[in-house]
Amino acid sequence: MNLEALCKEAELSFYDDELVSENGRKIYRIYVQKEGGVNLDDCARLSEILSPIFDVEPPVNGEYFLEVSSPGLERKLSKIEHFAKSIGELVKITTNEKEKFEAKIIAVDDENITLENLENKEKTTINFNDIKKARTFIIW
C-alpha cells in the first residue's frame, strides 16, 4: 500500500505515520500536509479513502483506531525531508550524545542540517544520523 499516492488522491501530501498506544487503545496516526494548511474536511476525505482499503489490508495487526491530522505547528522531525521543508523554522534537537540545540534551520543537504544559534548567530552543522530527537517550536 502506498500512503503517499493515497494522500495525493485526496490532494494532500503524506508527512509521517505512527502507531501509539493510549489508554489501552492502539491508534494508527497518519499526518498530512497541504499548501495553506489542512482542515477537518481534508482529514475526513482521506479517512474515507483509507478506511475501505484498511478494512481489506490493515496497516497494523489487531484492533486499532485510525486518526488523520496535520503534524501541527510544533511537529516532530524524523526524516531528512522534514528538515528540508522546515528551513527557516526554529527547532529543538537532541543528539545521540545528548547534546541539545535550540536554533533556526538554515540549510539542509542529503545528510546534514545546518543550524544558526538563536543567541549568538553561530552556525553548527549536524549529521542527520547523529540526531536522536527533533521538533519544531514556536516562540509566542
From Swiss-Prot:
What SUPFAM superfamilies does its record include?
Answer: YhbC-like, C-terminal domain, YhbC-like, N-terminal domain
- Name any one Pfam family assigned in the record: RimP_N
Compartments in which it is found? Cytoplasm
GO CC, sorted alphabetically, is:
cytosol
Keywords in alphabetical order = Cytoplasm, Ribosome biogenesis
Which example biological process does GO assign this protein? ribosomal small subunit assembly
Domain of life per record: Bacteria
The main location class comes to cytoplasm
TM regions (residue ranges): none
Q: Which PANTHER family match?
A: RIBOSOME MATURATION FACTOR RIMP
Q: Which family does it belong to?
A: Belongs to the RimP family.
The record describes the protein's role as: Required for maturation of 30S ribosomal subunits.
Question: Known HAMAP family for this protein?
Answer: RimP
**What name is this protein filed under?**
Ribosome maturation factor RimP
Its lineage reads: Bacteria, Pseudomonadati, Campylobacterota, Epsilonproteobacteria, Campylobacterales
Gene of origin?
rimP
